[in-house]
Amino acid sequence: MSGYGQQGVSAANIDSIRPKKRLSIGVVGSGNWGTAIAKICGENARAHGHHFRSKVRMWVFEEEIEYKGEKRKLTEVFNEAHENVKYLPGIECPPNVIAVPDVREVARRADILVFVVPHQFIERVCDQMVGLIRPGAVGISCIKGVAVSKEGVRLYSEVISEKLGIYCGVLSGANVANEVAREQFCETTIGFNPPNEVDIPREQIAAVFDRPYFSVVSVDDVAGVALGGALKNVVAMAVGFADGLEWGGNTKAAIMRRGLLEMQKFATTFFDSDPRTMVEQSCGIADLVTSCLGGRNNRCAEAFVKTGKSLETLEKELLGGQLLQGAATSKDVHEFLLTKDMVKDFPLFTAVYNISYEDMDPKDLIIVLQPLKEDSENEGGTETE
Amino acid sequence: MSGYGQQGVSAANIDSIRPKKRLSIGVVGSGNWGTAIAKICGENARAHGHHFRSKVRMWVFEEEIEYKGEKRKLTEVFNEAHENVKYLPGIECPPNVIAVPDVREVARRADILVFVVPHQFIERVCDQMVGLIRPGAVGISCIKGVAVSKEGVRLYSEVISEKLGIYCGVLSGANVANEVAREQFCETTIGFNPPNEVDIPREQIAAVFDRPYFSVVSVDDVAGVALGGALKNVVAMAVGFADGLEWGGNTKAAIMRRGLLEMQKFATTFFDSDPRTMVEQSCGIADLVTSCLGGRNNRCAEAFVKTGKSLETLEKELLGGQLLQGAATSKDVHEFLLTKDMVKDFPLFTAVYNISYEDMDPKDLIIVLQPLKEDSENEGGTETE
Ligand SMILES: O=C(CO)COP(=O)(O)O
């Protein structure tokens, strides 16, 4: 069955692989995660010159910024200073990363398109790229979350794939943009399992991202990788409620374990996910652990219990307008589970929804952790020997 | 393959199972974990009167203590006050738990023998019990750690089994004695997979321990359960070194993931362990998470980096003379791996040994986290497009 290193391939031996052609990398997005990813792509484009063309185009939504006392265009400043002074200040990107204000140029020139935009923009951005994509191009989505609609749960890689008619994989892991940008070691997971007609080997995709400080494992399981980054936020909220109640470390470990198993169950029940992905890869267990130790969802959920303020208020106070992903995802998941009549099969996800949106008492999380019993317990039975 | 709840059985429906006979429970040990376990056994003996005889005998190593200004015997005080005033003060045990100063009486009267003594005493305690065991009796070892000798790695359940000629399972999980004693919710794992001639179903064994606040999953994989509790200490030290170096959350999550996979690999390579146990059950992932968040090994390893003091000094200062399990286990494991010529297959375990006993720099843990490369990286290749 599974074992250490048995699932997945790394980019470790990329230089012994002879590629069919040198590929161009384009990055769609330039927020703090987008810029950190573009920096990595730029480093690898230079490091693996027989695999990649050096120039990495990064689409930047053009803005006027104040730079050294002057009003300047963000792309111009980036291309001069090799620094995204607005969204990733203090981090130097290699000079082969070029900021491009027109996403259509990125679309036209890339064989590998890396998507790192906030999920609410992805459809509109793709609309502008339609018809411009190179033959044989593929996408990699670094967008965490899932798109839920009446038709069900869709991965953003699926959204991109449908819009642009290309194969799209996923990258997700225990990766905080600023830590990655500062080259603090972390791991990540790529899900990439293209149909036969796609001519780019998975090692080459891994080599776009793998750095000495950013260790990539590439697996076939696209759905597992995408769902890990979405669902872990729900579990991080459950652990946050436990933090708020000052429950012990063992109780929190139990919530994490049960949450991880619900993540795995969700991915294997509704998608064709490999059960090992969630429990063994960075996109599952490791991302969950990081998020449960003081990530955004965790902190908001803790404050929810401790302060009695509403989640909307805390979202404003603690996240500066960012969406509290875990709560929103618990709602999406809940509505989806209702349509499948499977609410009771995901008691922890359901509890997070009920605490966040209904008036379930966080203390009742304990009840959720009990195994289902068919009978109530026969407390105080025979007492003689 | 695996999925939520698919590995293992719980005691949830114990009251619908009709047992062949009522069994007697004996607890060998009465330290703080031993007493917490005896409390649980006592509660379950009363709750499931058709499964168990009410009286639970707990072997107490007799000592004179000072109690309410008088010199008294520890067993007498326990049987009067239903409290282990020396090792688990402030916690009331049910009155059907009886302290017994003679381990032979416990041996003679129990069908289920629960072992909770410090590992260094287990052989001598068993020696006193030889020849007194009831026909059909089984053991459950709650002793964390492994016994390493020239012949290899042995589980304490194997030691007990050989000494007493009984089948012996294992209980281990994310369980801190004081939290369990105070009935803070946690989960645990039992490994119990007896040969056919043993007539006690695994649900009945699970029911000895399962409480509303102590949730048991019973699996077949005895080795995985036993090894989880031993090997997680090694990984907790690695995370402690990272804490000492003030590495980020993602780096620590990567160390935990890699450590968990080494635990799984060790258990599946040298024992017949199910790979799911380590990554899905409380005895693996959950116990590891708790231990990495400020457990003893974690704190000592952090202090080792921050203070520059030796581990022996820190053992004295921080653990009051208790053995630093993680360091000792890393040494045992290292010596065992040398005999198998497999040191390089367990780079994280090996690094913990080398940092603890040789003079490896903790910072070089990063190197260990890199995937093995066959070639050095072709940094600075072609740069033109
Ligand atoms: O995605 C992240 C880590 O990988 C960020 O975590 P939070 O959203 O929990 O802050």
Swiss-Prot record, chains A, B:
Residues recorded as bearing Phosphothreonine in the entry: 382
One BP annotation, GO: cellular response to osmotic stress
Binding site for substrate: 144, 296-297
Active site (record annotation): 232
MF GO annotations: glycerol-3-phosphate dehydrogenase (NAD+) activity; NAD binding; protein homodimerization activity
Organism superkingdom: Eukaryota
Chain residues that bind NAD(+): 29-34, 121, 144, 177, 296, 325
Signal peptide bounds: none
Modified residues annotated as Phosphoserine in this record: 376
Location(s), subcellular: Cytoplasm
Keywords noted in UniProt: Cytoplasm, NAD, Oxidoreductase, Phosphoprotein
Enzyme Commission identifier(s): 1.1.1.8
GO CC terms, sorted: cytosol; nucleus
Catalyzed reactions per annotation: sn-glycerol 3-phosphate + NAD(+) = dihydroxyacetone phosphate + NADH + H(+)
InterPro entries referenced in this protein's UniProt entry, alphabetically: 6-PGluconate_DH-like_C_sf, 6PGD_dom2, G3P_DH_NAD-dep, G3P_DH_NAD-dep_C, G3P_DH_NAD-dep_euk, G3P_DH_NAD-dep_N, NAD(P)-bd_dom_sf
Pfam family, one: NAD_Gly3P_dh_C
PANTHER family membership: GLYCEROL-3-PHOSPHATE DEHYDROGENASE, GLYCEROL-3-PHOSPHATE DEHYDROGENASE [NAD(+)] 1
Database matches in NCBIfam families: glycerol3P_DH
Family statement drawn from the similarity comment of this UniProt entry: Belongs to the NAD-dependent glycerol-3-phosphate dehydrogenase family.
Name listed for the protein in its UniProt record: Glycerol-3-phosphate dehydrogenase [NAD(+)] 1
Organism in which the protein naturally occurs: Schizosaccharomyces pombe (strain 972 / ATCC 24843)
